[in-house]
Each structure stands twice: as C-alpha cells, then as structure tokens.
Amino acid sequence: MLKNKILTTTLSVSLLAPLANPLLENAKAANDTEDIGKGSDIEIIKRTEDKTSNKWGVTQNIQFDFVKDKKYNKDALILKMQGFISSRTTYYNYKKTNHVKAMRWPFQYNIGLKTNDKYVSLINYLPKNKIESTNVSQTLGYNIGGNFQSAPSLGGNGSFNYSKSISYTQQNYVSEVEQQNSKSVLWGVKANSFATESGQKSAFDSDLFVGYKPHSKDPRDYFVPDSELPPLVQSGFNPSFIATVSHEKGSSDTSEFEITYGRNMDVTHAIKRSTHYGNSYLDGHRVHNAFVNRNYTVKYEVNWKTHEIKVKGQN
C-alpha cells in the first residue's frame, strides 16, 4: 500500500540553530507541520513513500527531504532509507535426501541508491566507514549555504540548521560501503562472527549453526535453536541509511532514483555421518553466496519544482 505524507518546515536563518533532538524526530514526522524557527532562508519540504513486496519480503520506507536554501546555488535532497528486510531463513531436506538437511540464511543485506541523471550528484551519505559495533548511530547535519556535515552519533557535538539521524542494530554483522561514486552508493551489512556453545566462530565456518540432533526427521532440528540465532538471521534487518544529493537548478524538472533492498544468501548443509563405532554426528558443509542479489528495487521519480514523488516501477 502506498502512503504519501507531506510536511513543510521553515527553519531559522540563524547559522547556529540547536542540533535537532533525534529522539523526537519520529514523533514530529507524524505532524502535518513542524515549526523550528522564524525566517524563510531555508525551507524543508518532506515526503514519505512506503512500498512493500511480499515476493521479496521487503518494505521500503523512504523519507525525501527537499532542502530549499536561498544561499545555496543547487537543489538538495536528503533521502533516509528505512524499512524492513526479512531474513527469509528456511530449513529443508537437501534434494529429498534423508541424511542431509539445509539451512538457507542471509550472509549479507544489500542497501543501495542509484541515479543516472547527469544533473544529479551524490554529495554525502551515512554510514561511511566500516562499522563493527552492534548499535549504529550517526547524524547528518545541514548548515545554510549547502554545507553538509556528519556527527559521530546521535549525541554528536554539532550545531546544524537541520539534521537527520540514523540508528540501527546489526548484532554479529558489520556495515561497509561496497561501491560509491557520484551517481550511486551501495552498502553491505555482512555476517561477521558469532558466539556459540563451542566458542567464537567466523561467519565462514562450515559448522556455523549446525546443531546436535542427527536422529531427528525434521530439518529444523539439524540446526541450533532460535535462541542461539542473532536477530538478523532469525527474523531480519531494519535498515536506516542516509544519502544526500544535489541537483543543478534550472536543469531538469524531474529525476529518477532506484533504491534497492535485498540479501545474499548462504546455504549450510548439516550432513548425518557415523563414526567407526556407529555413533552418529552432524558435519557441516557451506555454500557461500549460493543466492545473490535477491533484491527488491523501486524506481522513484522526484519532481524538483512540485516536490511530488511518484513510483515509476518495481521488480
């Protein structure tokens, strides 16, 4: 179901307006208008679009914040990419065998933004560097004149006319930028290492998630219980990423952006084997990137004059 929310914000002309309180950001987004200060040098016009695909198990919640700054010679747009990517973790008999069970799980979550418009350039994005912490919190701030800066966390010591924050959890995973240029950015949230009953294991360990019940007929029992799986494997991932783009004023009225959410899937096989003495045990075998780019891509059209957002296509 497509939702469209419109908010208009007028910001103070002061160059040192207080940093927006990120804890109030979501609550404010529910209002029709948001008054931050007097003056009209900067106007923030907001749109929100929601798109869901049951086929891909993905929901995109995209916030489009148009920055109308009289002291900046370009149009600017802040895109905050949120939503949910289901893990799609599944368990099954491998090729109808009785002694090999399979677990398909997300080794990597994909989040990407792309445009082919020659008048549009990517000027900033979050996160930028490889991040290994479980909880990720960063802020992108804007000051009059087209100055975008990032603060390290939600409590960053910055003073901005306007700011936008990201916050997400990635237990046992790491975030890094895989590709970036003037027209696109692609992040990968990748499995890293896991604490197990037998000690710390690499995400590439062939026995990762293999269980201890070789006599069960249920494929699920060949692998560790849900209580030993991190949220990004058991249920899914809630992304929160930001990209900022500029647009040449007086050029094109509209631009198109492709936003992609998805996953790369690994398959772990649990193989029932027997010792020389007849005792059964489970042996792991791993297929890395067995299914890649299982992605949901939505094409959004942005109108720089009317500030309308249209969905032009999806896979």
From Swiss-Prot:
One of its GO terms (molecular function) is toxin activity. InterPro entries: Bi-component_toxin_staph, Leukocidin/Hemolysin_toxin, Leukocidin/porin_MspA_sf. SUPFAM superfamilies: Leukocidin-like. It is found in: Secreted. Pfam families: Leukocidin. Keywords: Cytolysis, Hemolysis, Secreted, Signal, Toxin, Virulence. The keyword Signal applies. GO terms for biological process: cytolysis in another organism. Residues 1-29 form the signal peptide. Its main location: secreted. One of its GO terms (cellular component) is extracellular region. Induction: Less protein is secreted in a secG or double secG/secY2 mutant (at protein level). It comes from the Bacteria. Toxicity requires sequential binding and synergistic association of a class S and a class F component which form heterooligomeric complexes. HlgB (class F) associates with either hlgA thus forming an AB toxin or with hlgC thus forming a CB toxin. Belongs to the aerolysin family. NCBIfam families: hlyII. Toxin that seems to act by forming pores in the membrane of the cell. Has a hemolytic and a leucotoxic activity. This is Gamma-hemolysin component C. The lineage of its organism: Bacteria, Bacillati, Bacillota, Bacilli, Bacillales.
